[in-house]
From Swiss-Prot:
This is Undecaprenyl-diphosphatase. Belongs to the UppP family. Catalyzes the dephosphorylation of undecaprenyl diphosphate (UPP). Confers resistance to bacitracin. It comes from Paracidovorax citrulli (strain AAC00-1). Keywords: Antibiotic resistance, Cell inner membrane, Cell membrane, Cell shape, Cell wall biogenesis/degradation, Hydrolase, Membrane, Peptidoglycan synthesis, Transmembrane, Transmembrane helix. The chain crosses the membrane at residues 44-64, 85-105, 109-129, 159-179, 185-205, 215-235, 247-267. It is a multi-pass membrane protein.
Length: 274
């Protein structure tokens, strides 16, 4: 396989890994990176979905101790069962709404104005959330969340169906606005990502299975590997970062990126559509 093509796959994997779990929208960045690299045909869209697997593996690795302890304790400890139930409850709203509205959203909302607007609006929402009263925090750990907390975060996650919103951004900032600490909101967002990304990925790959080929296996393997490594580094960095910093820098970045979306769409350089 062409070395240049494999290099492009590596770059796309890094972009996916670095942006999947930051509140900046991986989809928007993959579209822009694909346009820059000339890696934006139908097969590239399937590739973008497939390399999310690497990011999922990274989260599982970072949180493996918690996941393992929960699985072992499920038969005997109510606390473990409640945590697992919370993840399931948070996951279900996105499943239901995706099945009902997924096609309509892809057909009508993937436009430059919508993508740019959600980037910019999301930036201002982050600024607002970070300036809320310190006393608003009532949940310091994911283990202290109630099923209602999980349901609310799950409903907020549905906003990520709108292009440019960012799944991690919606769940983290939504969780903070609902009273979760920055750490608890981030942790739950990452746990929620595991079933959400697996479900969305399997469903999308099944629909586009006619575009898959064994000949592309090296391409997908390279992208997945680089996605895994970069996502692992990014998640570990973010967990350290949030202990002493806010999400404000990401807010300004989103606003700036929204302007980039409008500029590239206006010049015709990037096709922000399905």
């Amino acid at each position: 396989m062409d070395f240049i093509l494999l290099a492009k796959a590596a770059v796309m994997g890094v972009v996916e890994g670095l942006t999947e779990f930051l509140p900046v929208s991986s989809t928007g960045h993959l579209i822009l990176a694909g346009a820059l690299l000339g890696f934006d045909d139908d097969k590239a869209k399937v590739f973008d979905i497939a390399i999310q697997t690497g990011a999922i593996f990274a989260v599982v690795l970072v949180y493996w101790q918690k996941i393992r302890e929960t699985l072992v304790a499920l038969p005997t400890q109510p606390r473990a069962r409640r945590f697992a139930l919370n993840v399931l409850i948070g996951f279900l709203p996105a499943v239901v709404l995706a099945l009902i509205f997924g096609k309509a959203i892809k057909a009508h909302l993937f436009t430059p104005v919508v993508v740019a607007s959600t980037f910019i609006l999301g930036g201002f929402v982050i600024l607002w959330a970070e300036r809320r009263a310190p006393g608003a925090v009532r949940v310091d750990s994911v283990d202290d969340m109630t099923p209602l907390d999980a349901l609310k975060v799950g409903l907020v996650q549905c906003l990520a169906m709108v292009p440019g919103t960012s799944r991690s951004g919606a769940t983290i900032i939504g969780g903070m606005l609902l009273g979760l600490s920055r750490k608890a909101a981030t942790d739950f967002s990452f746990f929620l990502a595991i079933p959400t990304l697996i479900g969305a990925g399997v469903y999308s790959l099944y629909k586009e299975r006619h575009l898959l080929s064994m000949a592309d296996l090296p391409l997908f393997a390279v992208g997945l590997l680089f996605s895994f490594v970069s996502a692992w580094l990014c998640v570990r960095w973010l967990l350290r970062y949030i202990s002493t910093h806010s999400f404000v820098p990401f807010a300004y970045y989103r606003i700036a990126f929204g302007i980039v979306v409008l500029a590239t769409a206006w010049t015709g350089w990037v096709h922000w559509g399905e």
